[in-house]
């Protein structure tokens, strides 16, 4: 069960200094920063902006929707350490992604890329690419106001990227490489060679 965070709270630096730390925090907490509508998608990135003394704006005066973080307030939200970037192919793990209005979410959506864009996951149903994303209130079949989870989202409504330049964008973790030159491997190779055993 996720621990609920309500209001503007200051986190420990080790909860948001890297994407992996932020991800660990997010997956164990529900965030309702503004006290409106419980855990909205906007609340999670807004809490991150707050840690840097910034406000993630939807529109001047507030009370907007997620896609307005890009369409109306892109430049207001791209304050250091955040920069705005265009283009799906530029998505890196840890980037904050903004999506436009769709039949699934008329308010748009805002979340974090949990993998780099690779162009490998084609969704034939929606004729678009998919990407694993970390966010709140997302995914089919969930109840509204769900705390953070990771789901594959289609990128058809993608608008843009806010990148935290304080995070070193480490590549998406992949499987470990097997090293074949451990002493026991070398010994086994030598033993096979002496016995004329071929593998």
Model features per residue range: what roles?
Residues 1-62:
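N-terminal capping segments
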Residues 4-19, 27-29, 110-191:
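Aromatic- and glycine-rich peptidoglycan recognition patches
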Residues 39, 105, 177-178:
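A generic "functional-site adjacency" signal
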Residues 40-43, 95, 189:
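Acidic side chains
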Residues 61-140:
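...with weaker cross-activation on analogous glycine-rich loops/strands in unrelated enzymes
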Residues 193, 197-199:
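Cysteine-nucleophile amide-bond enzymes
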């Amino acid at each position: 069960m996720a621990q609920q965070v309500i209001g503007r709270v200051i986190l420990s630096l080790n909860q948001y200094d890297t994407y992996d730390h932020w991800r660990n925090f997010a997956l164990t907490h529900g965030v309702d920063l503004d006290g409106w509508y419980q855990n909205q998608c906007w609340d999670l990135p807004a809490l991150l902006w707050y840690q840097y003394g910034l406000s993630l704006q939807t529109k001047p005066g507030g009370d907007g929707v997620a896609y307005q973080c890009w369409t109306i307030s892109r430049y207001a939200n791209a304050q250091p350490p955040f920069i705005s970037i265009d283009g799906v192919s530029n998505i890196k793990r840890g980037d904050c992604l903004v999506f436009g209005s769709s039949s699934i979410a008329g308010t748009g959506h805002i979340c974090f890329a949990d993998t780099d864009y690779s162009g490998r996951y084609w969704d034939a149903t929606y004729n678009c690419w998919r990407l694993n994303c970390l966010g709140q209130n997302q995914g089919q079949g969930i109840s509204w106001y769900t705390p953070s989870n990771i789901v594959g989202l289609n990128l058809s409504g993608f608008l843009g990227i806010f990148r935290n330049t304080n995070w070193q964008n480490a590549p998406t973790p992949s499987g470990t490489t097997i090293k074949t030159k451990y002493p026991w491997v070398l010994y086994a190779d030598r033993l096979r060679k002496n016995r004329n055993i071929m593998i």
